[in-house]
């Protein structure tokens, strides 16, 4: 199967995050950051930019091509907004409820909440929260619960933070912070089918499952007694990515620097359903397909991007998961960000957004 490169853009800063808007197949955001040379303050060295893009409809594209003799493929998606920051963007997630909300976590500890205006086609800031962090600590990842009223964030000191969001998204309050990992907590994620359960992965090579009810009842005055996870699995290398299946309960995908993808059944945690062969690089992002339940896509650092799927004759058997299609396209650097567009009605017009780091490359792949 031959991939189609819909479009390629080279951005101002190094790119690390791509997220499609859940309610329009053609709208997506890309997060970037830059380390400024010569600055001695670790956190102050980063600056960032958030881009909002729109993929042009086919008729609009044909009109543009006819009106421009020197057209090039950069016209196939266009920048409609950018926002500059004095801090690097390290992760973003859309809230999947109908409020059109995007959460953005940045290196210095800012947690920004934006609302997408579908008429004006722009992001509007609803709230900006300064997370209390020491100067050498970075915010690394975030995730929303399914209800859209809580967020979790992970940090480079191994901590995880739980945050409550008001109904109008004007205020974010930290409810709990706990020591989850001995080193960087690279990733955190909610269980979308049980909002009292969250997952985390860290550079201490551990995948952990936490019960929020237990955590909220944990006495922080018990100095030296950390909260206890429901489950801990030690991996060969650092755990870098986790994504809960959006429609199948108890199914979790976990990626690691060891280059292998593991699928876990939460009802049977003795061993994973499958541990894949090497995907060619550390698995930095995993995204389940929003509608085709037997597929996911990965960004594998030095190994490019891969779609994995189960046997088409037995799509529910995740032990058959294997690479269906791979993509490098124009990308010459570390594959960090990836996401599916939300086209429920026509999978032939399904887009995958991909970004890579040092080459500052963003592309749209049609599998």
Swiss-Prot record:
Residue stretches of each WD repeat: 84-124, 132-173, 180-220, 234-274
Pathway: Protein modification; peptidyl-diphthamide biosynthesis
GO molecular function, one term: diphthine methylesterase activity
Cellular component GO terms held in the UniProt record: cytoplasm
Broad class of enzyme this protein falls into: hydrolase
GO process annotations (BP): protein histidyl modification to diphthamide
SUPFAM superfamilies to which the protein is assigned, alphabetical: WD40 repeat-like
Keywords noted in UniProt: Hydrolase, Repeat, WD repeat
One Pfam family in the UniProt entry: WD40
Record keyword Repeat present: yes
Catalytic activity of the protein: diphthine methyl ester-[translation elongation factor 2] + H2O = diphthine-[translation elongation factor 2] + methanol + H(+)
Gene3D superfamilies: YVTN repeat-like/Quinoprotein amine dehydrogenase (2.130.10.10)
E.C. designation(s): 3.1.1.97
Reported function: Catalyzes the demethylation of diphthine methyl ester to form diphthine, an intermediate diphthamide biosynthesis, a post-translational modification of histidine which occurs in translation elongation factor 2 (efbA).
Family according to the record: Belongs to the DPH7 family.
The protein's name: Diphthine methyltransferase homolog
Native source organism of the sequence: Dictyostelium discoideum
């Amino acid at each position: 199967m031959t991939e189609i490169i819909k479009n390629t853009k080279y951005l101002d800063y190094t790119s690390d995050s791509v997220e499609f808007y859940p309610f329009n197949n053609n709208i997506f955001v890309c997060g970037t950051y830059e380390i400024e040379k010569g600055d001695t303050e670790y956190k102050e060295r980063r600056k960032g930019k958030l881009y909002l893009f729109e993929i042009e409809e086919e008729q609009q594209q044909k009109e543009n091509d006819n009106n421009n003799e020197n057209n090039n493929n950069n016209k196939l998606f266009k920048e409609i907004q950018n926002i500059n920051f004095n801090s690097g963007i390290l992760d973003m997630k859309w809230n999947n409820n109908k409020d059109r909300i995007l959460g953005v976590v940045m290196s210095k500890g800012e947690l920004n909440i934006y609302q997408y205006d579908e008429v004006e086609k722009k992001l509007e800031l609803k709230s900006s929260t300064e997370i209390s962090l020491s100067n050498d600590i970075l915010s690394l990842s975030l995730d929303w619960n399914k209800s859209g009223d809580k967020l979790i964030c992970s940090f480079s000191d191994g901590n995880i933070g739980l945050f409550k969001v008001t109904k109008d998204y004007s205020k974010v309050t930290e409810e709990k912070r706990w020591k989850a990992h001995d080193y960087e907590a690279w990733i955190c994620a909610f269980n979308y089918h049980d909002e009292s359960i969250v997952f985390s992965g860290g550079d201490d090579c551990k995948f952990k499952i936490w019960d929020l009810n237990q955590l909220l009842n944990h006495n922080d005055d018990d100095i030296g007694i950390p909260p206890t996870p429901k489950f801990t699995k030690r991996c060969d290398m650092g755990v870098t990515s986790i994504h809960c299946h959006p429609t199948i309960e108890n199914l979790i995908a976990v990626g690691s620097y060891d280059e292998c993808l593991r699928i876990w059944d939460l009802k049977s945690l003795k061993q994973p359903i499958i541990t894949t062969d090497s995907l060619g690089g550390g698995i930095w992002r995993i995204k389940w397909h929003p509608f085709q339940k037997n597929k996911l896509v990965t960004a594998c650092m030095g190994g490019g991007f891969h779609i994995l799927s189960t046997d088409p004759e037995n799509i529910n058997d995740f032990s058959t998961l294997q690479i269906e299609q791979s993509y490098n396209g124009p990308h010459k650097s570390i594959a960090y960000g990836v996401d599916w567009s939300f086209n429920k009605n026509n999978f032939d017009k399904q887009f995958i957004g991909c970004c890579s780091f040092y080459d500052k490359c963003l592309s749209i792949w049609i599998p």
